[in-house]
Curated annotation (Swiss-Prot):
Cystines in this chain: none
Annotated GO biological process: proteolysis
Stated role: Removes N-terminal dipeptides sequentially from polypeptides having unsubstituted N-termini provided that the penultimate residue is proline.
Name this protein carries in UniProt: Xaa-Pro dipeptidyl-peptidase
Keyword Nuclease: no
Organism listed in the record: Ligilactobacillus salivarius (strain UCC118)
GO molecular function annotation: aminopeptidase activity; dipeptidyl-peptidase activity; serine-type peptidase activity
Keywords: Aminopeptidase, Cytoplasm, Hydrolase, Protease, Serine protease
Record-linked SUPFAM superfamilies: alpha/beta-Hydrolases, Galactose-binding domain-like, X-Prolyl dipeptidyl aminopeptidase PepX, N-terminal domain
Length: 801
């Protein structure tokens, strides 16, 4: 257990006094009190749920100052000092005496836990200084102490003050607005789209939650999440549409194309006229009931931020069709931002006879969300839309080709074999859930869906005009907002190439960019114990949306990475891709810095039918056995080459390049590679451990979240680091098809998904080479075999030692 805080702002003593006064921890005259007296007042105020003097005395009597005295007894006879302050402080932070720390020596535990402390406390000002910092310190639940006090009702004293602006403490907005009095309403933004071609601009349903004080004139910024999922999905119908993956890859017609041959150009279309605005009102006519929300958004609702959700075109109660990642979905998100910024019209109902402005908005917007949600945030940012001040995009797609394809191959997102753009469009076309609406829209949508099925081209797997229209990287130069990117280093759903390419493209754009890489798969991280992610984003949004001068841009690391070998360890870096490449040659069964005699290595792609069927139904078993050093069922179906045991820990940082001289027995084929960490070790679990179910309160009598953390699991012999796949007819790029003659050797270069991986001392680095990937590629079980000539076959590894 260790805590990593990056959002703790160091401020001068005078500012600490002012801020403690602002949140009522200091009252008039307190600054003249003796150190013991002011310390006791601080303690009493730290128990807002104990209302009377007797109740507070009881609470304080349960805090041990020493092995023999509680804090009340101690203060009656002794002066507060640093040891006692932090012995009590650790208890306030939720740590247990004897289990987590020693009352006689709290400092050793604080060093181990990576918690800040003040070495000396003698005078009143020392107490004030230390108390301010303690309020900002991580508790055992990962939240700071002030958040824990807020959850107990500390800030309810501000509810009746009719505040017209937030209160900030240590650069972060505090929960001074009553979540029991939030205003919930619905509007319909008129978009710049007519995706269903009914002669009317598509109206987009927007769900709003805002503080009650906005009705009294308070202007607030908005946290906007564009979520095609939030009003439900068509799981059953999408499942029926899933494409079969029981197909071999086929030879492709040789086509030497240039990028210009497949480049997307926006067609000239004439939009229907805007609806006339006859009446304008401030009063919404609809509210909303239940929807799936993002817990970070929930957390910010008490802190002076509005939260908005919109599904976009084709979702329940909106107009139009789902288009899976193209410009229509981008513009749908952009248009909501424009309404929040005062530059677009919305209506109170689908009848569209009363316009309603975002009169409560200060015009500033941040977008949040993971996966498709983060993708739409990225997409909206590439429009350069005014009012979008920042995005916090998590596990976001930057090019849809890199989600559903790779290297001229149809590739399934991890866990979803057979899914494609058309399936996702159907999945998210939640207009289908409204029978009356669906009756009018289903024929047109099904016809539109058939064009997606055709244009996505599952036959060749090549990059084409369809995918070029869904490549946000082309428009990164338009981005004007600052960006926080978050991604899992073990995410095989939205693969790391997406954030890696976006991060690199942003290098030429004059915006602030921050990158956080965690050890998770496709997850949120705002409920981690070891990282103050929520505080970091609160600091960031307080700066970006309220203009608070809190050094957020300087405090948050440019690149923050969770270590893969240790629990609760986060490290800062200045770059992702290593500039240094180490060359290791392929030999008969090894990787080495020395080139040995030339050999030809061979593997087959075909499996016995019973084995093939077994792996189709147990992909997890295949994923284990393809990497295992001894695996009788796959012995001839892959090559495993390993380095010597490492003499010291090595960091793999960025993409690796695998150069192979390879021949296919047939006139078509594919090659797949994995880099593997071989060595017995306890490794972080694949998913975070739930430390306490619903253990995180997100406010006072408000919503909850699970408290989680990655923990070292049982010992395993290996772990996949990264992988890549390539169609041998796409040796030069993803859009141009090359010739491939049977049994002829060709030089290919395979670029892996990017890495940030510590390879421990004594472990071996392994390269696994095979063809069909039972988790990701098509699975035809074809009678094909491959040969690799070790002449000219080697790895270029991005190693930093």
């Amino acid at each position: 257990m260790k805590f990593n805080q990056f959002a703790h702002v160091k401020v001068p003593f005078e500012q600490k006094l002012a801020e403690l006064n602002r949140i009522a921890f200091l009252h008039a005259g307190d600054e003249d009190l003796a150190s013991n007296h002011i310390y006791r007042l601080f303690l009493e105020r730290a128990f807002p749920n104990f209302k009377t003097e007797a109740a507070k005395n009881h609470a304080l009597s349960n805090l041990a100052a020493t092995e023999n005295a509680d804090i009340l007894t101690y203060l009656n006879s002794s002066k507060i000092n640093a040891r006692v302050f932090y012995a009590v402080g650790l208890q306030l932070l939720g740590f247990e005496a004897e289990l987590d720390f020693d009352l006689k020596d709290p400092f050793s535990a604080m060093d181990k836990l990576n918690l800040p402390y003040q070495k000396e406390i003698h005078h009143r000002d020392d107490v004030i200084n230390a108390w301010y910092d303690l309020l900002c310190t991580s508790t055992k639940k990962g939240q700071n102490l002030l958040d824990i006090l807020a959850n107990r009702g500390y800030f309810t004293q501000f509810y009746q003050l009719n505040l017209t602006e937030p209160i900030f403490f240590n650069g972060k907005a505090q929960p001074v607005f009553d979540t029991n009095k939030l205003i919930h309403e619905v509007v319909y933004v008129e978009s710049e789209l007519d995706t269903d071609q009914d002669g009317k601009r598509d109206l987009l349903k927007v769900i709003i939650t805002r503080p009650a004080m906005t009705d009294n004139g308070m202007k607030v910024p908005t946290i906007f999440t564009a979520s095609p999922y939030y009003l439900g999905t068509n799981d059953a119908s999408a499942e029926k549409m899933m494409h079969s993956v029981d197909l071999p890859i086929t030879r492709k017609e040789v086509k030497p194309l240039s990028y210009q041959d497949i480049e997307y150009h926006k067609p000239e279309t004439k939009l229907p006229k805007k609806r006339p605005v006859v009446i304008s009102t401030k009063n919404a006519e609809e509210s909303w009931e239940h929807l799936f929300t993002y817990t970070f958004n929930d957390y910010m609702l008490a802190r002076g931020f509005a939260v908005v959700y919109s599904g976009g075109v084709g979702t329940l109660d909106s107009d139009g069709y789902r288009t899976c990642g193209d410009e229509a979905e981008t513009l749908g998100a952009k248009d909501v931002v424009e309404w929040l910024n005062g530059k677009r019209t919305a209506f109170t109902t689908k009848e569209a006879n009363k316009a309603i402005p975002a009169w409560w908005s200060n015009g500033k917007v941040a977008m949040t969300g993971k996966s498709y949600l983060g993708t739409l945030a990225t997409a909206a940012a590439t429009t350069g839309v005014a009012g979008l001040e920042t995005i916090i995009s998590e596990a976001a797609i930057s090019s849809w080709y890199d989600y559903y394809r790779e290297g001229g191959l149809v590739i399934a997102p991890g866990g979803f074999p057979g899914e494609d753009a058309d399936i996702l469009a159907e999945e998210c076309f939640s207009r289908q859930k409204s029978a009356g609406d669906y009756n009018h829209s289903k024929d047109g949508f099904n016809k539109f869906l058939s064009t997606i099925t055709k244009d996505q081209d599952r036959t060749t797997g090549n990059y084409n005009t369809f995918w070029d229209a869904r490549n946000y990287l082309k428009d990164v130069g338009n981005i004007k907002c600052d960006i926080v990117m978050v991604h899992g280093l073990n995410d095989w759903n939205v693969k790391l190439k997406n954030v890696f390419n976006l991060y690199n493209k942003l290098g030429d754009v004059e915006v602030t960019k921050k990158l956080i890489l965690h050890q998770g798969q496709h997850i949120y991280i705002n409920n981690f114990q070891s990282l103050d992610f929520t505080d970091m984003m609160n600091l960031w949004l307080s700066h970006k949306l309220y203009g608070v001068e809190n050094n957020a841009k300087e405090l948050l690391p440019d690149i923050l990475v969770q270590n893969n070998t240790k629990e609760s360890t986060w490290e800062t870096y200045s770059s992702w891709q290593s500039k240094n490449f180490t060359k290791l040659y392929l030999n008969s069964d090894s990787l080495s810095a020395q080139k040995k005699e030339n050999q030809t290595l061979e593997f087959s792609d075909h499996l016995p039918e019973t084995t093939f069927k077994h792996y189709q139904t147990d992909i997890a078993n295949w994923k284990e056995e393809i990497l295992a050093s001894t695996s009788p069922k796959l012995e001839t179906n892959r090559l495993i080459l390993t380095s010597k045991p490492l003499k010291h820990e090595t960091l793999l940082k960025g993409v690796a390049k695998i150069k192979l001289k390879i021949a296919s027995q047939l006139d078509h084929g594919l090659v797949s590679v994995k880099l593997v960490d071989y060595g017995d070790a306890k490794r972080l679990g694949a998913t975070p451990t739930i430390l306490e179910r619903r253990g995180l309160d997100l406010g006072y009598h408000w919503k909850e979240d699970n408290l989680v953390e990655f923990k070292l699991a049982k010992e395993t012999p290996f772990k996949m680091i990264t992988q890549a796949h390539l169609n041998l007819q796409n040796r030069h790029n993803d859009f141009s098809t090359d010739e491939l003659e049977a049994n002829k050797f060709y030089d290919v270069e395979i670029t892996t998904q990017p890495m940030f991986y510590h390879l421990p001392k004594g472990h071996k680095l392994g390269l696994v080479i095979y063809a069909t990937d039972m988790e990701m590629t098509l699975q035809g079980n074809e009678e094909n075999s491959y040969r690799i000539d070790t002449t000219g076959s080697y790895c270029l590894l991005p190693i930093e030692e």
